[in-house]
Amino acid sequence: MFESGAILIYLAEKSWKFYDKDQRTVINQWLMGQMAYIGPMLGQHHQFHHYNPGKSEFGEERYFKISEKIYKELDERLSFSKYLAAKNYTIADIATFPWIARHEWHDIGLKNFKNLTRWYEEISKRDSVKKGFAFMDKNEFPPKPY
């Protein structure tokens, strides 16, 4: 099995967790949005802005603007939904969180997005998230919003 979204769906179906049957259409929508839009665009922003600054002004500006738009869209969605796809934590949140966890690399200012910050802080407190951050480095933890 390959592809993170497919793996998350498989594990969720096997465990009966984070993938409520009555919410699957919306969960899949946000999961696919992460896989096709949020992840790739923030990944490009990482390449131009974080790893290779000064190499392409066009790339840096383009992906900064797209990343800022993503933050605004997520913040808007979270203004009327506790989590991205449902009232409960789902695989859509699991897939999206790691990209927002690198907010320090984005230089957008997570704290400027009230609802996205609330979502981020709530997920950061989950024991499984803390354990995941500490997997390779015992001192690693989700960065605080700034």
Regions found by a protein language model. Give the residues of each.
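GST superfamily/GST-like fold recognition
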Residues: M41-H46, L84-N112, T117-I123, K130, ...
